[in-house]
Amino acid sequence: ISGIVLTHSENAIVTDSASSATAYSTGRKTNNGALGLDKDNKILENLTERIHEYGYVSSLISTSEITHATPAAFASHVDLRWKTDEISKDMMESNVMTILGGGRHFFLPEEMGGKREDGLDLLQEVKSKHTLLTQKRELSGFALDNRDKVIGLFADEHLRDIEKPDNHSFEPTSSEMLDFAINRSLKFQEMGCKGFFIMVEGSQVDWAGHANNINYLKREMQDFDEAVQNALDYAIQSQDTLVIVTADHETGGLLIEPAAPADYTAPEVKFSFNT
């Protein structure tokens, strides 16, 4: 099945990730910058909240900080996507049982090297109330029958920072995080849950488009493609799983055309960005 998505927000022709993710998570369009609120700042019930009432378990996965707009729209209600102090608290207190990505700095106060302006050491609160994961190896060592809420913060900011390659070996790929979330969700089903929902965001595809960086873009598309393949493999095996692959907006105006315009049969192509 294929379809067309109209990505405009409530108050602009060009959307941002907050309003577009809110449209996906709630079924309602809203103003740019808003998360889980309508155009009048009234709280909208999101998908993870709705299905929790019916006995389903949810997971959120992102290669950005978990407080970034797309994952936040599925677990937070704030009027501006930049209010990360509020977003991180919302996500910690949400009913989403598995949240994986980057963003440790948004759980620590500025005096401890973090980015929280409220002075709260939320990382310590996560440790005391839930299970905190900080390295990729902890995914494979996790006991799946542990029913704690799991928050994985595998980097101070986003995952696999192109300027910090030495950290990459400690940070999971999208497909590794998805495998963990699927296996954990299946364990929850064994323990009585009716089913599960997993949102996976290839966050940095957008950033590579902003940077007009084709090598960065190819790396992120490869990472996302592997996660999609994992999802499809599981769906074929399970026979009762819906996989939706979509985007909230385009970035960069990427053009792919024949390297030799006069020869449309040539295998070589060239890439260019238009915005």
Task: Report residues per predicted region.
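Mobile, glycine-rich extracellular loop/lid and propeptide segments
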Residues: Y24-S25, K29-T30, D38, L44-E45, ...
